Amino acid sequence: MTPLNINLTMAFFLALAGVLIYRSHLMSTLLCLEGMMLSLFILLSLLISHFHMLSSSMAPLILLVFSACEAGVGLALLVKMSSNYGNDYVQNLNLLQC
């Protein structure tokens, strides 16, 4: 394993630990999830370029699109929670009703 792969894997697990540790506020959880998705994007891009798998070259782009959609939905939830409750605690997510 190259040092770049080790660093990216470590970045993924540090972001995962951030999700588990800082799960009280939605903003910090969303930032850690974005870190996880970006490290997965870079690892997947490096894996595809290293093994010359041209058949799955669209996979990193699809992952990036889903990451952007996840960020948009998360920020919409953050705005809705902030306007309703005045804070961004994750425990308020189960209180949101249509």
Curated annotation (Swiss-Prot):
Topology of the protein relative to the lipid bilayer: Multi-pass membrane protein
Pfam families referenced in this protein's UniProt entry, alphabetically: Oxidored_q2 (PF00420)
Tagged with keyword Lipid metabolism: no
Localization: Mitochondrion inner membrane
GO molecular function annotation: NADH dehydrogenase (ubiquinone) activity
Top-rank lineage group of the source organism: Eukaryota
Database matches in InterPro entries: NADH_UbQ_OxRdtase_chain4L/K, NUOK/Mnh_C1-like
TM stretches of this protein: 1-21, 28-48, 59-79
Alphabetized Gene3D superfamilies for the sequence: 1.10.287.3510
EC number: 7.1.1.2
Subunit-level organization: Core subunit of respiratory chain NADH dehydrogenase (Complex I) which is composed of 45 different subunits.
Role noted for this protein: Core subunit of the mitochondrial membrane respiratory chain NADH dehydrogenase (Complex I) which catalyzes electron transfer from NADH through the respiratory chain, using ubiquinone as an electron acceptor. Part of the enzyme membrane arm which is embedded in the lipid bilayer and involved in proton translocation.
Protein name from the UniProt record: NADH-ubiquinone oxidoreductase chain 4L
Gene: MT-ND4L
